[in-house]
């Protein structure tokens, strides 16, 4: 199904939950395409078939029954995977092994590891003269948020001033950061890598210059990074 919508679907997803969301998106696109074809054929039948059947008396009870059953079936086909995704997301929020507090500022992010005393830092976008070879422009930061893979992480998102949004498209993650409100979600990352995102809520003049860089690494490497950062 994903191959059919290649080029029109979401980005390549790097987590199990994001893959489910990608599949659900493609599944809904397939349903939408089927409904579009069916309605087009039905309109063609009503327009051109009227000339043939206008002199005959026709009972539409069976047609009315079908028009009631088909939408119900389509809604059920959407409801079952939607509830499954909602249930899976609820299971992710039941328990966590590490808590990271993310605070949005104009125009940078602050990270605080609540379970590791003293581990907190600010994350600013790197300027052009600070970039190393291979680092993406307008996306790389001076301090990445580093987390271990295969670990359930609870993120607590808030803001110190205006509304921001902590968003990582390749992970299907987007949560608003609002002052005075602590929004939480849990997530598990099955693969290592560096994932980039940006603030997705217009927050002022430099809104486009507060990127997000999330580095997922092995647990041993994460422990070494923690010790090195706190020294």
From Swiss-Prot:
GO MF, any single term: copper ion binding
Cofactor note: Binds a dinuclear copper A center per subunit.
Stretches in topological domain Mitochondrial matrix: 53-69
Record-level GO BP terms: ATP synthesis coupled electron transport; mitochondrial electron transport, cytochrome c to oxygen
Residues bound to Cu cation A1: 164, 199, 203, 210
Keywords: Copper, Electron transport, Magnesium, Membrane, Metal-binding, Mitochondrion, Mitochondrion inner membrane, Respiratory chain, Translocase, Transmembrane, Transmembrane helix, Transport
SUPFAM superfamilies: Cupredoxins (SSF49503), Cytochrome c oxidase subunit II-like, transmembrane region (SSF81464)
Superkingdom field: Eukaryota
E.C. designation(s): 7.1.1.9
Catalyzed reaction equations: 4 Fe(II)-[cytochrome c] + O2 + 8 H(+)(in) = 4 Fe(III)-[cytochrome c] + 2 H2O + 4 H(+)(out)
Binding site for Cu cation A2: 199, 201, 203, 207
Subunit and partners: Component of the cytochrome c oxidase (complex IV, CIV), a multisubunit enzyme composed of a catalytic core of 3 subunits and several supernumerary subunits. The complex exists as a monomer or a dimer and forms supercomplexes (SCs) in the inner mitochondrial membrane with ubiquinol-cytochrome c oxidoreductase (cytochrome b-c1 complex, complex III, CIII).
PANTHER family according to UniProt: CYTOCHROME C OXIDASE SUBUNIT 2, CYTOCHROME C OXIDASE, SUBUNIT II
The protein's name in its UniProt record: Cytochrome c oxidase subunit 2
